[in-house]
Design a protein with these regions (language model features):
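Outer-membrane beta-barrel strand-turn architecture
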Residues: 367-370, 404-406, 497-503, 588-592
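Intrinsically disordered, low-complexity Ser/Thr/Pro-rich tracts
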Residues: 365, 497, 506, 611-612
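Short, small/polar-rich motifs associated with maturation and membrane association
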Residues: 1-7, 12-398, 403-404, 409-416, ...
């Protein structure tokens, strides 16, 4: 019994001693005028034990040892440290000389906005991001004065036309320079601003930041005027957009997941002023009555629809029935045309589908006095709005900061990578007519353009005529398509040494590798492949522009350069860039009024771009793409 009593008393003594050593500290964090500082971090110095001030500035910190030191910090305010001497401790923070709203991030340094002589805007990523838009650069439209954003294509990977200072050059580029975490983002292929609206295949890899996850971006800094050229040289004559990615917060461990699901509905003709099939047939009938349409001429045209098909069927004999496909009588012709009149094909429903694009992002961040880290992975899956189109993108970002000698020596390591696989309808480069100034594209099968421009009298399952050969848009999309693969990896390290409170030197090194490949498959029975060998009659043979007319043999008829098989085109682009920068800065304030800022820098950049291409004509797709 005595032994049990001694054990109980000993246990009570241990509990009392533990209670005396650890306590719960509560209090408030506010400004000098009493305004609560929501989000201020209260941390036990030397540990990961921390709490965040609530909306009223109140905080509660548990397991605080007696005699410990609390450190309170908040962006834009000078940190405060106090020794724990009571269960309630209130903190009042003073605004620092450089508040966050007054700091300009140029990509090379952070400086007081009061001494920055250029025109600039700072935007938070949360204000720019648009739901359902995977590429965050499109959200800059209307967010900053003088910044014009023109979304020339809805296809993922195609960069929008961005103008910060208007048209800065007649023949040169007018697109801004992108800088991410102090490193210039080089394009894997240089596409000028005018070519962005061309619809060429290269525009799908024209965006410098398509590999960035929008959830990993903290803020944008837009440098608008000529001061940007003093920092980045002539390449910045069209402005600079500086992106800062997220970092870990000391004292707070945060795990987050973001899922976004976007449903895109099939477009509707009700949004466009387009005639229905009955109205179109009325126009065709008027053209026929006035002699603009006749059956004989439509048979040999390079492109024809209902009337061309009617001419073919009138001359198509079916031995099984002993009759022609369409009787060449007023009744027979009118019966066929009446079907087209009331067909009213909805090309949007034929070529588009209701789809759900979903993106997922998971991140973890934490930190202490010794350092912080932020890591995230992301995936975007787009099954495609139109047939024969889809995109999958995967991203990775790791951002760590280590304080080697407290606040004197800091090492920042950033690594990010992305991979994208994409399928899109086949497309050729556009051509400009130098005489008339018109732009044309051969074998254009863009689903959206086709739905807007094609007659609604056409049967979606029938083959009509284009390029002197049978054509059906759904069949062509399945046999004429492009596969793209884009990947990029970047690693950078920055070392900052604060020699004195006023003098700081830094060195940054970065290496980035980008690779993209585009494979254009044009199968044997596609309209494009057959156009190069269409010469059913002498009239078609003499008029088909895709047949070869040998200038050395003027008396010879045109002939095919693709008598059989299909076409395979592949383009590979590689870009390897290296950056090194060393700088020294001096900042001082005299009498709380005068600010002196000196900054010196030396920078070396190098980029190696390589492009290879291959074209294979006559490949047998049904035999494993063999010649």
């Amino acid at each position: 019994m005595k032994k049990l009593t001694i054990l109980i008393l000993l246990a009570m003594a241990v509990v009392c001693r533990a209670s005396a050593q650890n306590r719960v500290v509560t209090g408030t964090v506010s400004e000098e005028d009493g305004t609560p500082l929501t989000g201020a971090v209260v941390q036990v110095v030397g540990t990961n034990n921390a709490a965040t001030a609530a909306i009223d500035g109140l905080y509660t910190l548990k397991n605080v040892p007696s005699g410990a030191v609390l450190r309170v910090s908040f962006l834009g305010y000078d940190p405060v440290e106090k020794k724990v001497d009571a269960d309630r401790m209130d903190f009042i923070l003073k605004a620092s000389a450089q508040e966050i709203a007054s700091v300009v991030v140029t990509g090379m340094q952070k400086m007081d906005k009061r001494i920055f002589t250029g025109a600039t805007d700072q935007l938070l990523a949360s204000d720019v991001k648009l739901d359902g838009i995977s590429e965050i650069s499109r959200g800059l439209e209307g967010r900053s004065a003088g910044v014009s954003v023109q979304n020339v294509s809805g296809t993922f990977g195609a960069a929008p036309k961005i103008r910060i200072r208007g048209a800065t050059s007649i023949f040169g580029d007018s697109k801004p320079l992108w800088v991410v975490d102090g490193v210039i983002m080089e394009d894997v292929i240089n596409v000028d601003a005018n070519s962005l609206s061309s619809g060429d295949a290269t525009t799908l890899i024209s965006s410098a930041i398509a590999g960035l996850n929008a959830d990993d971006i903290e803020s944008f800094q837009i440098l608008k005027d000529g001061s940007a050229t003093s920092i980045y040289g002539a390449r910045a004559m069209a402005g600079v957009i500086v992106i800062t990615t997220k970092k870990g917060t000391p004292g707070i461990t945060k795990v987050s997941y973001t899922g976004e699901f976007t449903m895109r509905m099939v477009p509707s003709y009700s949004n466009f002023n387009i005639m229905n099939s009955q109205e179109q047939m009325a126009v065709y009938q008027e053209m026929y009555d006035k002699g603009w349409l006749n059956y004989a001429n439509t048979v040999y045209r390079s492109e024809s629809g209902v009337y061309g098909k009617l001419s073919q069927l009138i001359n198509t004999y079916d031995p099984a029935t002993g009759q022609f496909a369409v009787l060449n009588t007023p009744e027979g012709r009118n019966a066929y045309l009446r079907q087209a009149e009331f067909r009213n094909t909805d090309w949007f429903k034929e070529l588009f589908r209701n789809s759900i694009q979903h993106s997922h992002s998971a991140s973890i961040s934490s930190g202490s006095e010794k350092g912080s880290y932020y890591a995230s992975v992301g995936a975007m899956v787009d099954p495609g709005w139109s047939i024969q189109s889809k995109v999958n993108r995967y991203t990775l970002l790791v951002n760590t900061t280590q304080h080697i000698l407290k606040d004197k020596l800091t090492l920042n390591l950033i690594g990010n990578a992305s991979y994208r696989e994409q399928r899109a309808p086949g497309s050729l480069s556009s051509e400009v007519d130098p005489v008339f100034g018109t732009v044309k594209r051969d074998f254009d099968i863009n689903p959206y353009s086709y739905a807007l421009r094609s007659s609604r009298t056409l049967d979606p399952d029938e083959f009509y005529t284009r390029n002197y050969t049978p054509f059906n848009i759904k069949d062509e999309l399945s046999k004429n398509y492009m596969d793209l693969n884009v990947s990029d990896v970047k690693f950078q390290a920055e070392l900052k040494w604060k020699i004195t409170p006023k003098v700081e030197v830094s060195a940054l090194g970065a290496i980035k590798y980008q690779a993209s490949s585009t494979e254009h498959h044009i199968e044997d029975s596609s309209n494009q492949a057959q156009a190069y060998r269409s010469m059913a009659t002498s009239i078609i043979q003499s008029n088909n522009p895709y047949l070869y007319d040998n200038p050395d043999e003027p008396n010879r008829d045109k002939y095919s350069i693709l008598p059989q098989g299909g076409i395979y085109k592949r383009s590979d682009f590689r870009a390897k860039s290296r950056d090194f920068r060393a700088s020294i800065s001096y900042n001082d304030t005299f009498n709380d009024k005068h600010i002196l800022n000196l900054f010196g820098i030396v920078e070396v950049n190098a980029i190696d771009r390589r492009a290879t291409s291959f074209q294979g004509w006559g490949l047998q797709y049904d035999m494993g793409e063999t010649p």
